[in-house]
Amino acid sequence: MSPKKAKKRAEGANSNVFSMFEQTQIQEFKEAFTIMDQNRDGFIDKNDLRDTFAALGRVNVKNEEIDEMIKEAPGPINFTVFLTMFGEKLKGADPEETILNAFKVFDPEGKGVLKADYVREMLTTQAERFSKDEIDQMFAAFPPDVTGNLDYKNLVHIITHGEEK
């Protein structure tokens, strides 16, 4: 295949991934990519992943775990590759699983709960920021337990099914 045809094919493949998502979703993925691209070089590499984990409080991530994540990509992880990888993972995923996976990023031990203060901080400082009123409404509807933890698994179930487990 000529270089021009190969380039054209790659461009075509890339444009398909953008048609899988609504513009607002693409913007949200872009914000997530920007947060993970710690060194702002336009690519997510091992150091970016390690720094992202550290920012989430997970400092002892094994090199093998990071290597496995990087190997999932067909090459350097720019935004288009990042979007493609998420597109493949989200194809056919149900909304409950998708929302749960978003919370699990912040719960590396898989406890099913997050500190309410941490959730409040993340929702008011990252991506599409919640207003104080929106946060207050959420915590009024889904109050943390006596230890200050938010049971996000139950929260996601209520969001997606409209009822408590």
Swiss-Prot record:
Domain of life from the UniProt record: Eukaryota
Keyword flag Isomerase: no
Modified residues (Deamidated asparagine): 14
Keywords, alphabetical: Calcium, Cytoplasm, Metal-binding, Methylation, Motor protein, Muscle protein, Myosin, Phosphoprotein, Repeat
Protein location: Cytoplasm, Myofibril, Sarcomere, A band
Any one Gene Ontology molecular-function term assigned to this protein's record: structural constituent of muscle
InterPro entries, A to Z: EF-hand-dom_pair, EF_Hand_1_Ca_BS, EF_hand_dom, Myosin_RLC
Modified residues (Phosphoserine): 15, 19
GO cellular component, one term: myosin complex
UniProt modified residues of type Phosphothreonine: 52
Pfam families the record matches: EF-hand_7
Modification after translation, per record: N-terminus is methylated by METTL11A/NTM1.
PROSITE patterns linked: EF_HAND_1, EF_HAND_2
Amino acids binding Ca(2+): 37, 39, 41, 48
GO terms classed as biological process: heart contraction; heart development; positive regulation of the force of heart contraction; regulation of the force of heart contraction
Modification N,N,N-trimethylserine occurs at: 2
Principal cellular location given in the protein's record: cytoplasm
Domain EF-hand: 24-59, 94-129, 130-165
Function (record text): Contractile protein that plays a role in heart development and function. Following phosphorylation, plays a role in cross-bridge cycling kinetics and cardiac muscle contraction by increasing myosin lever arm stiffness and promoting myosin head diffusion; as a consequence of the increase in maximum contraction force and calcium sensitivity of contraction force.
Oligomeric form and interacting partners: Myosin is a hexamer of 2 heavy chains and 4 light chains. Interacts with MYOC.
Note: This chain binds calcium.
Stated name of the protein: Myosin regulatory light chain 2, ventricular/cardiac muscle isoform
Gene name in the database record: MYL2
